[in-house]
Design a protein with these regions (language model features):
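Active-site-proximal mixed secondary-structure blocks
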Residues: 1-15, 20-115
Length: 115
């Protein structure tokens, strides 16, 4: 799950299937989001997000966050997930995630259906 936003009122979670490592030195990863996704506009503006790894225990939340829009619901509240302050960026981490990776956007590559 990818979390983003600058303040609790804006916090959102997107379920992202297309992600991975693209460089080890310097460490860099990627996510691929449809332009229509609510999180796309937040991340494009704030230039930061958190990759929150999931477990089997988070399967329901991961699925639900992938089919609901953050424009209409507070995903943290609806799924009983806890937003916690990230040490280095404003985007929140998901406390229930076993591993959270803070990310700053270096480049947005426009690629048709996804960026």
């Amino acid at each position: 799950m990818v979390s983003c936003g600058q303040s609790p009122e804006e916090y959102n979670i997107a379920t992202v299937a297309w992600t991975g490592t693209i460089c080890s030195d310097p460490p860099m990863c990627y996510i691929s989001l449809r332009k229509e996704r609510h999180s796309h506009s937040i991340i494009s503006r704030t230039r930061e997000f958190v990759l929150n790894l999931t477990t089997e225990k988070l399967a329901k939340q991961t699925d639900w966050c992938g089919v609901k829009s953050g424009k209409n619901v507070n995903k943290f509240k609806e799924m009983n997930l806890t937003a916690i302050k990230a040490p280095n960026i404003n985007a929140p981490m998901i406390e229930e995630s076993p591993l959270c990776i803070e990310c700053r956007v270096v480049e947005i590559k426009e690629l048709g259906s996804h960026d």
